[in-house]
Amino acid sequence: MSKKVLTAYNAIDHTYFSQLSQRNKALYMYRSILRLANKWESDSQREDIRYETRSTFQKNKDLTDTEIINDKIEEARSRMLTALHYNIPYEKKKYNIPKYQIQMKPPPDPKDESGIC
């Protein structure tokens, strides 16, 4: 019997996940991430995943605002799927491209005869 390969597509049973309570979703994510860590190739990365998972969930255990909790669950799900897809256990860097304000001059007023714009 071959081992089931964990991918971004089969890591989460979305039908089951959508029916869970908020607490159970958090537990489901916690267990899923630890299962992912057990299957990770590199020992050092495996330990990093376990440590970060435990510390992050421990840090957020006292949250009470449902919106923030849902955001944290979604963040955990997203990071797990990113790790599976890119095969990297660390958060993918986000690049912020600076937005420059371009000040455009208004078009010249056709009624203005001064010629100065």
Curated annotation (Swiss-Prot):
It comes from the Eukaryota. Disulfide bonds: none annotated. This is LYR motif-containing protein 1. Belongs to the complex I LYR family. The gene is lyrm1. The lineage of its organism: Eukaryota, Amoebozoa, Evosea, Eumycetozoa, Dictyostelia. It holds the Pfam family Complex1_LYR. Transmembrane segments: none annotated. InterPro entries: Complex1_LYR_dom, Complex1_LYR_LYRM1, LYRM1. Coiled coil: none annotated.
